[in-house]
C-alpha cells in the first residue's frame, strides 16, 4: 500500500498551533488578579526606584511563565517612553541546572557574545559571582530584571537567591539596579528556602492557584475559537466566553475542563486533551469531535503524563516502586512498609546502589503517594495489633514495569525469568 498524499486539514483544525505548548495568546484570561499583583510589584521600576524581588509559585500549567512574560514585555514596551529609565531583562530556565554555580555561569554567558562564553565548571564560586557582578555593573541600563524560571531545580543550593537580590545592598553592583524574579512549580521549595534567602528574595510573593473547571472551560473556549474550523468564541461582559461550533459536540469542552480540573487544574493538561481529541477525530476522518474522542484522549494524555513523571524519578524512588512491584506480582498488596523495605534492600544490593534507611524509604513512599503513583491506607488493629500504613499502586502496574525496565540501572533486575514475567494479570 502506497503513502497517501499530504493535504491541508479542511475539516477539523484551522490553526492547531494555538492548542500546543509554546503558543502565547494575545490575552491571558482567568489570571486578572495575579497580573494586577505582578504589574503593581514592578511599578517601582518605571519610577526609577530599585525593583522589588518577586517569587511566583504554583503548579505546572497555571500561567506563571506566561504571566511573567506578558508583564515584563509590557514593562519593556512602556519604559521606552520614560526618560531616565532603561530596563534590561534576562530570562533563564533553570530546569536542566542543579546548582547556584550553574545558574550564575549561564547568566554570565547570556550577557557575553559567543566568542567570550565561559565553561560551566572550573572556576571558584567567588570568582563566578564576581564575574556575574561585573557583567551587571557594565550594563548600559538603569535596571536589570533577572527572571529565573523553574528555579526549584537547584534544590537546597540556593546561594544565588541570596547573592543576586542583595547585589545592590552589598555594593557588589552599584550602577545597575538589580531585581530577581523567581518562578517555581514546587511548593516545598519555597518552604525549604533558608531564612536569609526568604528575607532577600520574597519582597513580594504571588501564588498562582490551580484553575477550576469553569476557568479551564473559558480558556478552552477562547483557544477553540481560533483552533477549529466552523468555530467562534465571543467574550461576554462578565468575562466568560460563549462558544459556537459546527464540529465540537456540546460535551467536548466541559469534559476536557473537568478531566483537567480533577487532575491538576492545569490549563496545559486541558489543552492537551482538547488537541488530542481533535487529533483522534482527524485520524478517523470524522466531521465532528465527540465526547468519546475526549475520553480516549484523556486516557492517552494521562498515560503519557504518568510515564513522563515516572521516567524522571530518581533511582531510589524507582527502586522503591520496583520493590512494591515484586509484592504486587506475589499478590501481597496492599503491603506494609517493612515488607517493601525488605524487597528494596535486596534490589538495591543487586545493582550496587546505596542502601538507604527504613525511614528514608518511608519518606520515598510518602512522596510517591503525593505524586499520585501509590495509594496508602491506614490500618488500626487495636492495642495488640497497633496501627500501620499499607501501600499499593494507584497507577497501572504494567506501566510502572514498562518504565522501570527502560532505566539502564534497573534493567538487570528484570533480566531473570522471575522478574521479567508480564503483568497482564494486574
UniProtKB/Swiss-Prot annotation:
Keyword vocabulary terms for this entry: ATP-binding, DNA replication, Nucleotide-binding
Residues given in the record as ATP binding sites: 62-66, 211, 223
The UniProt entry's sequence similarity note says:
Belongs to the CDC6/cdc18 family.
Q: Which GO terms describe its molecular function?
A: ATP binding; ATP hydrolysis activity
Which biological process annotations from GO are given for this protein? DNA replication
InterPro entries in alphabetical order: AAA+_ATPase, AAA_22, Cdc6_C, Cdc6_lid, ORC1/CDC6, Orc1/Cdc6_arc, P-loop_NTPase, WH-like_DNA-bd_sf
Q: What is this protein called?
A: ORC1-type DNA replication protein 1
| Pfam short name (any one) | AAA_22
Q: Where are the transmembrane segments?
A: none
Q: What does this protein do?
A: Involved in regulation of DNA replication.
PANTHER family named among the record's database cross-references:
CELL DIVISION CONTROL PROTEIN 6-RELATED (PTHR10763), ORC1-TYPE DNA REPLICATION PROTEIN (PTHR10763:SF22)
SUPFAM superfamilies xref list = P-loop containing nucleoside triphosphate hydrolases, Winged helix' DNA-binding domain
